[in-house]
Each structure stands twice: as structure tokens, then as C-alpha cells.
Amino acid sequence: MEGTKTADVNVGQEKASEKGESIHYIEFDKPYHFEGKEYRGVELEGAWELTTKEKISIDRMYERLKEERPANPILSTLYAVCVATHVTKLPLEFFYKMRASDFLKVETAVRRAFFMPD
């Protein structure tokens, strides 16, 4: 796409990771265009480094957005959106508009961060 900037979404990360360099980098099936930029993936390393205070902040974001409270919010898609938004510093809309197949990769990685730490 002409005139489109490319970002390998290291947004919100202190150090830039090259595509595939980090085990927590999620590569999309095909480039994703959002607000004039092209994204090839997202770095989710921050999900493995969350503090309790950050999780409380994510819980509060989730509470503002949810309509019903599932038995285990961590297993909901919306909670994964909230975590991904927090760790990447990308807006909610970035994840809302993403192809479902790509977001399933993100959602799976977020769940791994909680249930299968490094």
C-alpha cells in the first residue's frame, strides 16, 4: 500500500525486537493496516512481566468494558484485548478491527502468559 508506514509493532516496548527475534512476538498471517500504518505483528513480552498493580489496572479496564462477568474473566476474549492493549500501548480499536485468526494468536499468547509463565 503506497504511502503507508510500516511498523513492526514494538510499540510500548523499551527495546525494539526484530520480527521473530522474541519468543513473544506474534506474527500476523498477513499485514494489518491500522490508522495509516502497516503492522506485521505485535510484541507481547510485557504480558509475561505484568505486576499485580498492572493486572488490577487491566481488571478495571475490563470492568468498564464488559456487559456480563464470566466465571473466569482471564479466559474471555475481551480480557485478552485489555491485556494486549495494556502491554502494547495500542488502542482497543486496533484489536477490535483485527482479523479473528490473528487475534486468536494474540489471545492464546496472553493466556499462556498467565497460565504457562516462562
Segments predicted by a language model, with ranges:
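Short, surface-exposed, charged amphipathic helix/loop patches that serve as local interaction elements
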Residues: E2-D118
